[in-house]
A protein has these predicted regions:
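Small-residue (G/A/S/T)-rich helix-start motifs and N-terminal tracts that mark the onset
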Residues: 1-86, 93-110, 115-242
Length: 242
């Protein structure tokens, strides 16, 4: 919302309804049936398919957990979406053994792995990913055909495996739980505002890094949190517009 999305619909396990309703006042809620693991059940697939036609873009994976149902839902979204799809976190983990399914999506896809998720996609170690981040980014692009956002120190973005944007904003204090979810949400918001996926990813990475630097200067790296970064976004976006 702080990055300009006009409306957000949040799909979540219905058992989490009390917690979600108390913490998400700006969102339209879509509670879904859970499986025995307490995660979103694949029995919701028809309902999810119906919702896809009502969106400008879809983000899948943040906080979902990872099991067979997660994979089935992620594959359904990719095969049926007519709007751009952003895949993060457990969406990536659920698809790691069938990552090529991303190529079946007829709409643009943005995938946002951190080094650990990138290593699982590529079947290598994190140290191998970090040793040559551009090569890892290229390899993920070749497997998926997606815009790749390889997070970490100096986040890298590519849309073709040949040209790379290396981000220079941000600091180590941003390496905290929820920071990656925030980035995916910013990219989602920008795409919903009709910014092309690669540009949305680049602008999202840059803007979040700026927010992280502002928060670090206000509160220190130890005091850098996604909530505080999110609060800085409207001012950053206004300055970038000017």
């Amino acid at each position: 919302v702080n990055s300009g999305a006009g409306l957000i619909k949040l799909a979540f396990p219905d058992k989490a309804y009390p917690a979600v309703t108390s913490s998400c006042p700006e969102k339209i809620l879509l509670p879904l049936m859970t499986n025995n693991n307490g995660r979103i059940s694949s029995q919701n697939i028809k309902k999810i398919e119906d919702e896809l036609g009502k969106c400008d873009a879809v983000l899948i994976g943040c906080g979902m957990g990872c099991d067979h149902d997660t994979a089935a839902i992620a594959e359904t979204v990719l095969k049926n979406s007519t709007v751009p799809v952003i895949i993060d976190a457990d969406g990536i983990n659920a698809l790691k053994d069938n990552i090529n399914v991303i190529k079946s999506c007829l709409s643009p896809v943005v995938i946002t792995p951190h080094p650990g998720e990138a290593a699982r996609i590529l079947g290598c170690t994190v140290s191998e990913v970090e040793k040559d981040r551009k090569a890892a980014c290229k390899a993920i692009f070749e497997k998926t055909g997606a815009v790749v956002v390889l997070k970490g120190s100096r986040t890298i973005v590519t849309a073709n495996g040949m040209d790379f944007y290396v981000n220079l904003t941000g600091n180590p204090g941003m390496a905290t739980a929820g920071s990656g979810d925030m980035l995916s949400g910013i990219i989602l918001s920008f795409i919903c505002q009709k910014i092309k996926p690669f540009s949305a990813a680049v602008c999202g990475v840059f803007a979040q890094g700026m927010a992280g630097d502002i928060v670090k200067n206000k509160y220190s790296m130890m005091g850098t949190t996604p909530t505080r970064m999110s609060e800085e976004l409207p001012k950053i976006l206004r300055s970038l517009e000017n």
